[in-house]
């Protein structure tokens, strides 16, 4: 019997979020729960996400969009975060991730980034 060879691909953006496209018109966490055909299986994504690595790679742009520059300080989690950001996070957003993260790594080419004003034990710096 001839059977087709198949491969399943899951496309996601480099920042780790399911991406609805290049614009900010749709937000996966807010809008996909209202779309028939997507909302029924969205819980599977979140269940799998909970079993993945304890390191998260994301961008300052996404985190600023999610409101970390204004949110109240979170409880510490066992997850370590790597953020790529040149201009989207303010000092509060950096402190938010220092509080949230087991370890926090910021990748930036901006020598005036607000992160350089923050001192925290879990921040990794290389020169």
Regions found by a protein language model. Name each.
Residues 1-100:
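N-terminal nucleotide/polyanion-binding subdomain common to many enzyme families
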Residues 101-127:
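Histidine/lysine/aspartate-rich catalytic loop segments that bind and position anionic ligands
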């Amino acid at each position: 019997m001839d059977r087709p060879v198949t491969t399943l691909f899951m496309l996601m953006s480099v920042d780790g979020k399911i991406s609805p496209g290049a614009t900010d018109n749709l937000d996966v966490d807010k809008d996909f729960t209202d779309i028939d055909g997507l909302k029924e299986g969205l819980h599977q994504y979140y269940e799998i996400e909970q079993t993945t690595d304890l390191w998260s790679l994301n961008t300052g742009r996404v985190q600023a969009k999610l409101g970390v520059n204004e949110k109240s300080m979170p409880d510490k989690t066992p997850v370590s975060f790597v953020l790529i950001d040149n201009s989207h996070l303010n000092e509060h957003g950096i402190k938010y991730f220092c509080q949230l993260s087991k370890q926090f790594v910021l990748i930036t080419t901006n020598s005036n980034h607000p992160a350089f004003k923050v001192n925290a034990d879990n921040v990794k710096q290389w020169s």
